From Swiss-Prot:
The gene is trmB. The lineage of its organism: Bacteria, Pseudomonadati, Pseudomonadota, Gammaproteobacteria, Alteromonadales. Its EC number is 2.1.1.33. The active site is at D143. This is tRNA (guanine-N(7)-)-methyltransferase. SUPFAM superfamilies: S-adenosyl-L-methionine-dependent methyltransferases. Pfam families: Methyltransf_4. GO terms for molecular function: tRNA (guanine(46)-N7)-methyltransferase activity. Catalyzes the formation of N(7)-methylguanine at position 46 (m7G46) in tRNA.
Length: 238
């Protein structure tokens, strides 16, 4: 599970400035991850700056763009990019070994429709992603911060989902997945109250795992043990 951001939120879901140093997320790189960063960052890495990027310039084409927040080691993100060459993918991850692993897998597979940030997700969204530009935002298995006193660290909060709404196109979708039922309920509560979104579930709750989200090894194992996974998909409608 990825912490995806160094942000913290208050009880009303208002984003507070960073509370921990980004440097703490560097982590220890394997030799392979270090080589991947050296080899593939020049072509696939996006250096953060507080100016909005131009997707057409970044990818060399016009295509719908999907952004994933906190991709972990990147295996499912690389698989999605390989399975949907017609889409652009941007991954954001604060854990450097994960960035190296993702770049290595994508680079060695010849993936050309994926770019990666090694930075805080909230800052990337606030400053580097143009408004009304994303076809989909993905948040898969974020840290659930299961202790009640840590719930303010959960990334799905009212102000954050309003930030995402600004970045999604009309018709764009925010897709979440979690294996913590309490966090799924929290996500559903926050999203159902958020203005400008429509739940894509017929029951106004959860949706079956869509084909575009790969089934992870962790998830496969959990399902055999009877563990649940909850997917939520909310469309920006205004």
């Amino acid at each position: 599970m990825s912490e995806v951001t160094t942000a913290e939120f208050n009880e009303d879901g208002v984003y507070l400035r960073k509370v921990r140093s980004f440097v703490l997320r560097e982590g220890r790189l394997t030799t392979g991850q270090a080589k991947a960063l050296e080899s593939f960052w020049p072509t696939m890495g996006l250096d953060y700056s507080p100016q909005a990027i131009n997707f057409t310039e970044v990818f060399g084409r016009e295509a719908d763009t999907v952004l994933e927040i906190g991709f972990g080691m990147g295996a499912s993100l690389v698989e999605m990019a390989a399975n949907a060459p017609e889409l652009n993918f941007i991954g954001v991850e604060v854990h450097k070994p994960g960035v190296g692993a993702c770049l290595g897998e994508a680079g060695n597979a010849g993936i050309s429709n994926l770019r990666v940030y090694h930075h805080d997700a909230v800052e990337v969204l606030e400053n580097a992603i143009p408004d009304s530009s994303l076809a989909r935002v993905q948040l898969f298995f974020p840290d659930p911060w299961h202790k009640k006193r840590h719930h303010k660290r959960r990334i799905v909060q009212p102000e954050f989902v309003e930030l995402l709404r600004r970045k999604l196109k009309i018709g764009g979708v925010f897709h979440m997945a979690t294996d913590w039922e309490n966090y799924a309920e929290h996500m559903l509560e926050v999203m159902s109250a958020a203005p400008g979104y429509q739940n894509q579930s017929d029951t106004q709750t959860y949706v079956p795992r869509p084909d575009h989200r790969p089934l992870t090894k962790f998830e496969n194992r959990g399902q055999r043990l009877g563990h649940g996974v909850w997917d939520l998909m909310f469309e920006r409608v205004e």
